[in-house]
Regions:
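Short, small-residue-biased leader/transition segments that mark boundaries at the very start
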Residues: 2-3
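C-terminal catalytic domain of photolyase/cryptochrome flavoproteins
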Residues: 12-235
Length: 235
């Protein structure tokens, strides 16, 4: 429940009490061990790791801008009129409820904002403004570290970016104009930041894929990306 998550993040709900209740509920209701373990791991594993990163490296993360991006977030990213269907859906959902799932935050909103080269401080502010469970200790590592890779890899070995293919596979959104724009931005990003990606064994092949791409397809991707960026940066 999102509202319990808010109480947990601010410290009004004790994590030990929640763990005790969860374990007892799992025992009484014969919940599969893998489901119980996954839930508990999020509470005392990943969640505490994020808290630890904030305490130890939060100041470093929030004052770094690895990519050097300075663009402001335009109005369309607040009212859900970007024309990018999965993104607009997530924006409208968080506007209505104050909450979107972690994967939506990371792989839809954060992913697309990184491809648009927004200032990480702007991205941090956006998430703090729209999320009911937003607190500084949660958002600093999740935005500057995971989502925008502004810390240069303190928390992860690669940025969480993808083409539209990942979004399509993980959802029921159909291909369309939005996916053409997303792919254009993705390949533009790979090309523009090739000096970084070529050194990463997990992503080097994507640079090679772009280099081997048909010249007309390559130019179409880049033109689509530039047209979209010019549009949003001139709102």
């Amino acid at each position: 429940d999102v509202y319990k998550r808010q109480l947990l993040n601010v410290g009004l709900l004790n994590i030990k009490d929640l763990l005790d209740i969860s374990i007892e509920f799992s025992r009484v209701n014969d919940i599969p061990i893998n489901s119980t373990e996954g839930f508990i791991r999020q509470l005392i594993g990943w969640r505490e790791f994020i808290r630890g990163i904030y305490i130890a490296k939060g100041s470093f993360e929030r004052t770094n801008n690895f990519w050097g991006f300075k663009s402001k977030i335009p109005k369309s990213f607040y009212d859900g009129t970007t024309g990018i269907e999965p993104l607009d859906s997530s924006i409208k959902k968080v506007s209505d409820t104050g909450y979107i799932h972690h994967i939506e935050r990371l792989m839809i909103v954060g992913n697309f904002m990184l491809l648009c080269e927004f200032d990480p401080d702007e991205v941090y502010r956006w998430f703090m403004e729209v999320s009911i469970d937003s607190f500084d200790w949660v958002m600093v590592p999740n935005v500057y570290g995971m989502s925008q890779f502004a810390d240069g890899g303190l928390m992860s070995t690669k940025p969480y970016i993808s083409s539209s293919n990942y979004i399509s596979k993980m959802s029921d959104y159909k291909k369309g104009n939005w996916s053409d724009i997303w792919d254009g931005l993705f390949w533009r990003f790979m090309d523009k930041q090739r000096s970084f990606f070529i050194k990463n064994p997990r992503l080097r092949m994507l640079v090679n894929t772009f280099d081997k791409m048909d010249i007309n397809k390559k130019q179409r991707h880049l033109l689509t990306a530039e047209n979209f960026l010019n549009k949003i940066h001139n709102e």
